[in-house]
Amino acid sequence: MIDFLKLPSPCYVLDETLLDRNLAVIDRVRRESGAEIIVALKACAMWSIFPELARHSDGATASSAAEARLVFEEYGKPAHTYAPVYTDRNIDEILRCSDHITFNSVAQFERFGPMALLRGISCGLRINPQYSPVETDLYNPCVPGSRLGVTADELNDLPAGIDGLHFHVLCESRPHHLKLALEAVEKHFGQYLDRIGWLNMGGGHLM
């Protein structure tokens, strides 16, 4: 039992019992579904436990150059990077620290994708399946006019060099929300699914 009165303040306290319980859930989902689980740092960026997280996952995501560097240097694996914006100032660091990069649009891929492909990085495209259970428009990536992913009518064909598709429409969501999201993806993007090597279904899964 932790005596919280004896802890220095401020400090971060990690309950290893609860962590082990969560990791057991992740292990079961990986085993029974066959899916790879990629940890989002915004859920837990305590780098001192990265070795333990790495043993129970298939990598970690990054949404910025700084996060990509943290994954690369402390998680011990290149990052699966998806960022809202890529710029000439941050792209070199992102390329150095990533082995998967997802782009928001075809134009963004056309600008930075060739640089990633030259380094052997697997490139993906974020899609907008026009479904999300998120009720607050500010946080809903599928609202009309969203720049977070391409809709089916904006994608005439899968660009050469795109290995995967990525949708991120959930937030602390349950399995039935993922089912509905997958149905929307199949409806709007099903013709591309047999042409890709991976499908990133995160994040936002409450596990």
What are these regions (language model features)?
Residues 1-13:
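Generic N-terminal amphipathic, Lys/Arg-enriched alpha-helix
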Residues 2, 133, 197-207:
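Flexible glycine/acidic-rich beta-alpha junction loops that bind and position SAM and/or redox cofactors
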Residues 10, 14-17, 173-176:
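Short, surface-exposed alpha-helical recognition segments that flank or form part
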Residues 18-20, 67:
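Active-site anion-handling motifs in enzyme catalytic cores
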